[in-house]
Structures are given as C-alpha cells and as structure tokens.
C-alpha cells in the first residue's frame, strides 16, 4: 500500500503533522498561497528525510525561501517540480548541497539547476529530466550535459529549453570541437529542445538513442539552417518502425512548424521556427524541408496550413517569390496528395503556375485537395507533360457542381472516404 501524508493548500500542517505517524510526505502547493499554507510549506520542507514528492508553484520570494530550506539531502525524494508565479526575469537556482539519490522525475520550468548540472551526478534513477527557461547565467555546453546524461541509464524523457538564443553566433565555434563518441541513451523515448540549431546539432551528435520515438524541437530564427545530425537522428527513429507517411507545414502568427505526426506508429516529429513575417516563415520551412529531404521523401500525404481562414491582412501586401514555395515543396518527391488551406490558395496557385512544367517537381502527385480550384493551368500542364493530377474538395465540403472539377475528375469516392477517416490532421 502506498501510504503517505499530503501537505497541500488548505491543510493545517503545522498543527497536525507532528501528531501523525511518520509516513512519507507529498508536498504540493500552488499559488495563491495563504499565510497558513506558507507556514505549512516551510514546516514540511524541514522534514526533508520524509519527503517523497515536491510540487511547488509559488511567488518568487516564497520560492527563494523554500530553496534555502532545500540546501540539504532528500534521501526519499522521487519527484521534484519547482516553478514560480509572475516575474520571468527573476533568476532562482537550486542550492549546491541539494541531493536526491532516488529522484526519478525532475521538472524545473523556472528554477535553474546548479552550475555544471552537479545535481545529476547523484540522481541515477532519473527517468524524466525537464529543464526549461534556461537563461544565459545558467548556460551549460552540450558536452557538460552529455557527460551528466552518461550516468542516467533509465532516462526516458529529456527536455532542454533555453529562454534566449545562446550561444550567440559569434561563439558557436566553441561547439564545433565537441564531437565525441556518442553516449548511449538506451531508454530515451522523447526529446524536446528549444534553442539554436548549432546547440541542437552538437547535442544530437553526442548521443545515441535507438528507442527514440518523439522529437519536439523549437528553434530561434536564423539566416541559415544546417541540420545533418538531426537528419541522422530521424533516420534512426524511422529504422525501428514504419517511416513517416504524412507531413504538415503550418504557418502561425509568430512561428512556422514542420510536423510529421503519428499515423500507424508511435513516431512523432515536430520542428518549429520562431519568426513573424510570412516570407521568412516560408524560407525557414523551405530550408528545414530541404535539410530533411531524405526523411521527407517517403511522405505520401502533405498539407499546407495557416492559422487564419484567409491570408492575414498584414501578410497580403508583401510579394512572395514563387520559387520560395517551389523550394518548400520540392523535397516531397513521394507525395501523392497535396492539401492546401484556403488562406494559401492564391499564393500556391501562382507558385504552381510557374513550376508546373518541371517534370521533376512533385513527380508522384496525384491529387490537389482544396476548397476552391485555382489550379486549372497547373492541372492542364501536368496532363501535357504526362503526369496528370486531379483536383478534389476537402473532406466535409459540399459537392457543388463545378465544370473544372468535372473536367479533371475529382478523387474517387474511396479516396474521399479514406480522407474523412484520416487521423493525421493536426491541431490548429
């Protein structure tokens, strides 16, 4: 039986805890905090030898006092999550003397780990390691992280998220000499990263994760993206099961994402780049897809999506070079279906008009799926070059008589039924 005592909001810990059996403690307090709760937190933390679980979300000043009380040994602690309310510029650090040899779950969304990640040397059973909002003052190089990961054989989930783009481009040369024999992380299944591509490349070059199935990456914007090590990692992911068969590029207000979602297997890949202007987003997506062209070559269903029903007003004035769209679409040589959101129809119709005569462009494409057929010229051209493409309405659209659709023949009903049951459509 898992018998323990819960120290939570609203419980009179100070007056009752000393009169209860010495069972393990679960300490869980979430803002807002009363004066009684605050005293209860401090009282419980002083009993560090009995604490099994700590989950605190507090104001910065109160969290600072808790960290002072945590500057010691927690022999029973298995779960630790520390975050604070409000001020994102406050820097709080886990004390150097804090040790938790039985820790299995470490989640620090706001509190920084000790310098050089010394905490990890004493937490061998760790299964989940989440370090978020890492500031410049808490920066650690990939080789330091990997050296600590070497001693975590049970690790299944790793999340490293920087709050700013570090290192700066002028200092990225420091990462180029960090290529070493990869450290095996035999149980790692999920990797999340937020930062710059040079750090990501250095990190994935130093690990070997044969069981990785989920990869979630967010990169800060930069001029050039080179991702050979990431490409290799995705190849390893696909070697353990079916390859990715569907992909989506999603243009949002402040980021663009390239996603290959779960389909018949547990594999999941998502890469986002933080940028605002549409031309930047298209260029970033084109570079990402180009860098991962080998991994995208097996995709059969490709979708272009945008966060608004129509092209946002602030994006309508800029002229997008059609060749940029061409570079984005070019890696999808195996795609049979191209689904286009209504907000992107005019942009894509212009781009396909330019590139329609290239027989090497989307050579296996069979269907364009969209709410309106603006692709007559492209469809006619593909017939002339011997690579016919059909137009089809998306699932759920009313079947309105349309001469263009009849002329080029819509997708068979069996394809429409399959599209209606498709599970790969992504979240907005």
Feature locations, PLM:
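Leucine-rich repeat
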Residues: 1-428
């Amino acid at each position: 039986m898992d018998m323990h005592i819960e120290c939570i909001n609203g419980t009179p810990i100070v007056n009752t805890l000393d009169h209860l059996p010495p069972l393990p403690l679960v300490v869980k307090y979430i803002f807002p905090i009363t004066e009684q709760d605050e005293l209860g937190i401090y009282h419980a933390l002083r009993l560090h030898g009995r604490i099994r679980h700590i989950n605190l979300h507090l104001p910065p000043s109160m969290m600072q006092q808790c960290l002072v009380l945590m500057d010691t040994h927690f022999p029973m602690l298995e779960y630790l999550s520390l975050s604070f309310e409000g001020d994102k510029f406050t820097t709080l650090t886990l004390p150097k003397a804090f040790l938790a040899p039985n820790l299995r779950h470490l989640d620090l969304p706001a509190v920084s780990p000790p310098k050089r990640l010394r905490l990890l040397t004493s937490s061998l059973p760790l299964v989940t390691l989440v370090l978020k909002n890492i500031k410049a003052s808490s920066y650690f190089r990939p080789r330091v992280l990997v050296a600590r990961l070497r001693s975590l054989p049970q690790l299944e989930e790793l999340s490293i998220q920087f709050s700013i783009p570090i290192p700066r481009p002028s200092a990225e040369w420091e990462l180029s000499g960090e290529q070493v024999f990869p450290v095996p992380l035999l149980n790692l299944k999920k990797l999340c990263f937020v930062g710059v591509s040079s750090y990501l490349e250095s990190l994935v070059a130093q690990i070997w994760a044969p069981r990785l199935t989920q990869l979630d990456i967010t990169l800060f914007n930069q001029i050039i993206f080179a991702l050979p090590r990431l490409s290799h990692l995705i190849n390893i992911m696909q070697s353990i099961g079916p390859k990715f068969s569907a992909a989506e590029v999603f243009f949002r207000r402040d980021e663009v994402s390239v996603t290959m979602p779960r389909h018949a297997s547990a594999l999941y890949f998502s890469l986002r780049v933080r940028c605002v202007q549409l031309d930047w987003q298209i260029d970033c997506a084109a570079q990402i897809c180009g860098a991962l062209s080998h991994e995208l070559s097996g995709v059969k269903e490709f979708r272009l999506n945008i966060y608004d029903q129509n092209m946002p007003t602030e994006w309508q004035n800029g002229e997008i070079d059609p060749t940029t769209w061409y570079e984005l679409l070019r890696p999808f040589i195996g795609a049979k279906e191209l689904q286009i959101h209504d907000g992107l129809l005019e942009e894509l119709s212009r781009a396909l008009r330019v590139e329609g005569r290239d027989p090497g462009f989307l050579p296996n494409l069979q269907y364009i799926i969209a709410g309106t057929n603006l692709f007559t010229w492209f469809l006619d051209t593909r017939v002339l070059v011997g690579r016919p493409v059909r137009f089809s309405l998306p699932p759920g659209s009313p079947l309105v008589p349309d001469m263009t659709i009849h002329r080029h023949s819509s997708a068979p009903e069996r394809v429409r039924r399959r599209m209606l049951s498709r599970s790969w459509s992504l979240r907005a």
